[in-house]
Amino acid sequence: MARKKISLIGGGQIGGVLAQLSALRELGDVVLFDIVEGLPQGKTLDIAEASPVDNFDVALSGANDYADIKGSDIVIVTAGLPRKPGMSRDDLIATNAKIMQSVSEGIKQYAPNAFVIVISNPLDAMVTLCQKITGFPSNRVMGMAGVLDSARFAAFIAWELGVSVKDVNAMVLGGHGDTMVPIIRYANVNGVPVMELLERKYNNDKAKAKEVMAALVKRTQGAGGEVVGLLKTGSAFYSPASSAIAMAESILRDQKRLLPVCALLNGEFGVKGYYVGVPCILGSNGIEKIVEFSLDAEEQAMFDNSVAAVKELVDSMK
């Protein structure tokens, strides 16, 4: 049986880590595409030369021609300018929209049967543009945001409580921006509600527990900017790459994982015609199901606010 083929569009920081992770997990043969000659070839050669040490058997190649992504099973798009300190994700829209147009046309021509995972910012707008230009069905075009935002939320909870990140379950919905919605009610450590653990940590001081949780939520919403501010020359790349690989692996290996995915909604959660982060089951058919659940009044208000921000951003491209 032929190996799967994974094409990565954009040979920058995220693209390089994506190529390495794809190889380490042996998800399939890897093509790293970039417009800069030599860059993707050099990165993939470097990773391939580690194969005897890391024990992986996949072919890696660099490309400067979209024809090389032909026959891809999955395409992950990271192409675009990264954020710099003081910039919001939305500040990138004009420049990255032009890049996304050309990328989407290349995918449509050479990988018409591929699943597409978009990472480029501003995510909600870029994935919308990609789906519109490719014309692919919505189950095959999705954005990576919620997996990363949820991972950040879970990490902050684990560090606050002094527990293993492996035991923390946390979900973040909505747009990939400052209005994202961490769902506090369902956050738990191996089934024990996080709020209950926080209250116990602070001697049953409910006000203090709420204050701490509010700080964790705020840090989650600004987590990308926190990394940008520290790096000064770019944005996060390890955690976004890991998050996209989790999605790709669930599709390629038909794992049926329930993950927060930026998906095109058709009435779910009361939203129609926009890409928003919601829980989805990812399997061999891409987005196989959008999983709805009830939101309380506060969560619904935050979700509505997040959707409004997404609509404003996406509509600004029209």
UniProtKB/Swiss-Prot annotation:
Top enzyme category: oxidoreductase
Catalysis: reaction(s): (S)-malate + NAD(+) = oxaloacetate + NADH + H(+)
Positions with a binding annotation for substrate: R83, R89, N121, R152
This enzyme's EC code(s): 1.1.1.37
Highest taxon in the source lineage: Bacteria
Residues at the catalytic site: H176
Sample GO molecular function, one term: L-malate dehydrogenase (NAD+) activity
Alphabetical list of Pfam families matching this protein: Ldh_1_C, Ldh_1_N
UniProt similarity note: Belongs to the LDH/MDH superfamily. MDH type 3 family.
Name of the protein described by the UniProt record: Malate dehydrogenase
Gene behind the chain: mdh
